[in-house]
Structure formats: C-alpha cells, structure tokens
Amino acid sequence: MINSPTVPPVIRRTFDRNMGAFLRPGDPTPPDNQRAIRPAQQVFSLGMEPLSQNHPMRDSAVAANWRFLMAATAGSGLYATVTSHDAPEFTGLARGAPAAIAVQADQDVRKLPAAQAENYNLSVLAIPGLLTEAFWLKWIGPDGKESDPARDLIVPFVTAQKQLMPMHPYTVEEFTRIAAPLAKKKLQSFKRLEEESQGRVKQQQAAAQEKRNAWRALARAPEPPRAQPV
C-alpha cells in the first residue's frame, strides 16, 4: 500500500494563499472541486555526481519542492509547485502534457502489484541530468519507520533514457546499476564540452592578444622619412 506524505502546514498555507492568482479559465478550481486535488508529492532532486559514484540515495537526494496534483478530466492535468525552503515560495503551475502525465502516473503507480505488496511512503525523485523523474517508494517496516533503504522501489514515469522502462518498479540496486553508468557518461560528456569551450576561449584570447600586440608595435614604429623638396 502506498501512503501519501503529510504536507507541512507552512507549505499548505503557501499553496492555498497563492493558487488562485495563477489559475486560468477552465483550470480545475480547488475550492469548487475538492475531488480534483490529489495527494501532494514531495520531490527530491538527485545530482549526477553522487549518482555516478553510487552514493546512498537517501543521503544524496535533496528535498526540492512539493507538488499539488490536480485533474479536471481524464487526460488533462494541472499541478502546482511550492519550494521546500525555510520560506516556501509558490513557483507556478504546470499544464498540458507534462501535468497530464504526472497526474496519470500518480494514479497508475498505486495500482502496481509491487506497490501493493508492501507499505511505502510515496515521493518523487527528479534527476535533471538524465531528464528523468521517478516515484521513490520508501519501504515502511513493521515499526512504521522507513528503516531499510535497500527495500525501496524506484518507478520511472518520465525519462529520456531508453535503458529505463516507464512504470517498471526497480529496486534501488537495480536502478543504480542502470542509472549510475548513464550519469558517469553524461558527466564525462559535460567535462569534454567544458574543456572544448575553454580551449576555444583561450584561442580567442590568444588571437585578441596578438592583435593588441600588433597595434602596439604599429603605434611604436617610427614614421618613415618625408621626401625632401627638390
């Protein structure tokens, strides 16, 4: 069974106070349609460096924001984002295909047999460097605590990586075995591009310096003698 997180009161107040200012005609309106609001999701962001080095996910992922999912009709969606800062900010609404995918995926993940076999706390894991978002199902032990990270599940629902299957539940070990090499390859590519960019900058600086030296040399050169009248 999947449990939705408890939203901190300050996050909820930020959502309630700012939501109306961002709505457009036709958007689902929370006060008028409470059924349109789905449980909120806490989003964690995972960087490429810790992922590539197989650092423990629970130690490396950083709390980024909260999402409040809403749906007016099947296939269309809307979600609001509130940051997880000490002073939370309402950063806006997502509409269209990305929102529809997020809303539908939230419904689908709850129906997965693997998710129903144990108790989990639901959150979202965003890996911007891999253009991937996944549900992070944190296993809950008999004591009611998230006590064994090895039993967590990762379920990608948006990804640009063909090696990852959307809506397939991976153990953390399985997911890391696939994603870590991808992150390492991306980092190497970023480093190569950075080195190439720095090389071009140095070439441009050297060319500019040569021009400056040429102008200085020209400025210091003595004037040629003037022709004497006959």
Identify what each model region corresponds to.
Residues 1, 67, 223-225:
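A composition-driven signal for long, intrinsically disordered, charge-rich low-complexity tracts
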Residues 29-86, 130-143:
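Exposed beta-strand-loop-beta-strand "reactive/processing" segments of non-cytosolic proteins
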Residues 1-55, 96-120:
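Short, non-transmembrane alpha-helical segments in secretory-pathway proteins
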Residues 78-128, 145-228:
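A short, surface-exposed interaction/processing loop segment used at functional sites
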